[in-house]
Amino acid sequence: MRDATPFYEATGHEIEVFERAWRHGLPVLLKGPTGCGKTRFVQYMARRLELPLYSVACHDDLGAADLLGRHLIGADGTWWQDGPLTRAVREGGICYLDEVVEARQDTTVAIHPLADDRRELYLERTGETLQAPPSFMLVVSYNPGYQNLLKGLKPSTRQRFVALRFDYPAAQQEARILVGESGCAETLAQRLVQLGQALRRLEQHDLEEVASTRLLIFAARLIGDGMDPREACRVALAEPLSDDPATVAALMDIVDLHVA
């Protein structure tokens, strides 16, 4: 049974750019804040293009071997197991490296030959050199807000990609996303969007992160399930945004102005 196409509300020309990049064998870089729809966009495009998707959530301990594969030992001896990047190349699918700057530096070395005209993947441990088929696509993402001197994409890496900038949607679009993702009433969606915009204005004051579209969707789903709106906004918005009780209380004052 085919999986349903994920809901996605386009905010610009990102679908057209992605499709053109795929047709020409160009890798794509997605940059934008947490919870603004980067991962959902890749899921949507994989289904739209009818391609297998291999998603990897990058972290500090993720190295090239985790992407390429490794030899395993079992009762029947030693065998090679492909990693997600290798499987995507073999199958001609999409490999999505989410928050790629979090991974170790050797991962960058591994993807460079795939992100230029060579479109090759070298498996040093098996001696194979895989030529990516035309349908293969490499997609990476990162949050520019987390950039620092120790963790960031080098210019030599960024310039191998077509880049798409994502941000939180305009109010009307974000309301449609909330309705589409949660099934909530349009009036509730509009109030939650207004709340989200009010919370985002606090970014430069008390919060390290702002209220993402993802968190607004969580709140809409909980309210739609019958939870008290104020409590839903507390657990889905205020508490995830801060551990400081005074800050949470201040956020709840803003919630009371928009939802309760």
UniProtKB/Swiss-Prot annotation:
Which residues of this UniProt protein bind ATP? 32-39, 92-99
Is Amino-acid biosynthesis set as a keyword in this record?
no
Among its keywords, does the record have Calcium? no
Query: So which domain of life are we looking at?
Result: Bacteria
* DNA-binding region residue numbers: 234-253
Q: Name one GO cellular component term.
A: cytoplasm
Kindly indicate where the leader peptide sits in this chain. none
**Keywords noted in UniProt:** Activator, ATP-binding, Cytoplasm, DNA-binding, Nucleotide-binding, Transcription, Transcription regulation
Please give one Pfam family short name. Answer: AAA_5
GO function term, MF aspect, one: ATP binding
Q: Where is this gene product found?
A: Cytoplasm
The induction text for this entry reads: Under denitrifying conditions.
Task of the protein:
Activator of nitrite and nitric oxide reductases.
Task: State the family named in the UniProt similarity comment for this chain.
Answer: Belongs to the CbbQ/NirQ/NorQ/GpvN family.
The entry's protein name is Denitrification regulatory protein NirQ
